[in-house]
């Protein structure tokens, strides 16, 4: 709705009249009417505020879970069955053993003197080695004593070995053999190893140096 404000202008000179109270009230009414109309147009443009929603509060109560049901009772043990009765069986009777047959009698003829075989006589002991006449130079530095075997020394083994040593014309050892053992292999071996390195004075035959043999005792003692 549109209102036109019409102000009548009067010529001052024509009427030379001032504003009356009625005119002032009319003008004020018209202005108020226009303001009211303007306010009516502005009010629908502002949307009313929606009322604030109230916060919803949910109450939660915690309840303990029910306990699990107890396990079922174990089944009753099976009843022990009595063992079956044992039958007593009579042992079988042994069958009779037939008697052994009688051995036949054999006549053994008596041996005659000519049928008796005499065992052969044992061989004669070997003769002692001959020509054991080479002299031994006791003071010679080339006759070093044998080394005591460590195993025999630790075990406290003692003994005597008698060696037969073959010597050539120059006094060198050509062969060593054991005439009497000490009953210990380590002692016998140590004596033979030492004798192979010895040096002797050769024997003399008709004023000439000749080969020969010498008997040397070697004693192993823990002194």
Curated annotation (Swiss-Prot):
Gene for this chain: tonB
Descriptive protein name: Protein TonB
An annotated Gene Ontology molecular function: energy transducer activity
GO CC annotations on file: plasma membrane protein complex
InterPro entries per the UniProt record, alphabetical: TonB-dependent_transducer, TonB/TolA_C, TonB_C
Positions on the Periplasmic side per record topology: 45-223
Membrane topology, Cytoplasmic segments: 1-23
Annotated spans, Disordered: 61-143
Transmembrane segments: 24-44
A GO biological-process term: transmembrane transport
Subunit structure: Homodimer. Forms a complex with the accessory proteins ExbB and ExbD.
Function, in words: Interacts with outer membrane receptor proteins that carry out high-affinity binding and energy dependent uptake into the periplasmic space of specific substrates. It could act to transduce energy from the cytoplasmic membrane to specific energy-requiring processes in the outer membrane, resulting in the release into the periplasm of ligands bound by these outer membrane proteins.
Skewed-composition ranges (Pro residues): 65-103, 119-129
Keyword Cell inner membrane recorded: yes
């Amino acid at each position: 709705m549109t209102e036109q404000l019409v102000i009548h202008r009067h010529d001052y000179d024509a009427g030379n009249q001032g504003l009356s109270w009625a005119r002032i009230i009319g003008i004020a009414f018209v202005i108020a009417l226009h303001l009211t109309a303007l306010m009516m147009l502005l009010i629908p443009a502002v949307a009313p505020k929606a009322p604030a929603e109230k916060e919803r509060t949910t109450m939660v109560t915690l309840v303990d879970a029910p306990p699990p049901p107890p396990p079922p009772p174990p089944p009753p043990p099976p009843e022990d069955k009595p063992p079956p009765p044992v039958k007593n069986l009579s042992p079988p009777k042994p069958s009779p053993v037939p008697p052994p047959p009688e051995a036949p009698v054999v006549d053994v003829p008596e041996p005659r003197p000519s049928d008796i075989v005499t065992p052969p006589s044992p061989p004669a002991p070997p003769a002692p080695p001959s020509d054991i006449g080479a002299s031994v130079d006791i003071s010679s530095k080339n006759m070093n004593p044998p080394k005591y075997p460590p195993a025999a020394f630790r075990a406290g083994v003692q003994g005597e070995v008698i060696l037969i040593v073959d010597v050539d014309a120059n006094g060198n050892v050509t062969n060593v053999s054991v005439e009497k053992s000490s009953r210990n292999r380590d002692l016998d071996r140590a004596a033979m190893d030492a004798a192979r390195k010895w040096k002797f004075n050769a024997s003399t035959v008709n004023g000439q140096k000749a080969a020969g043999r010498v008997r040397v005792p070697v004693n192993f003692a823990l002194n």
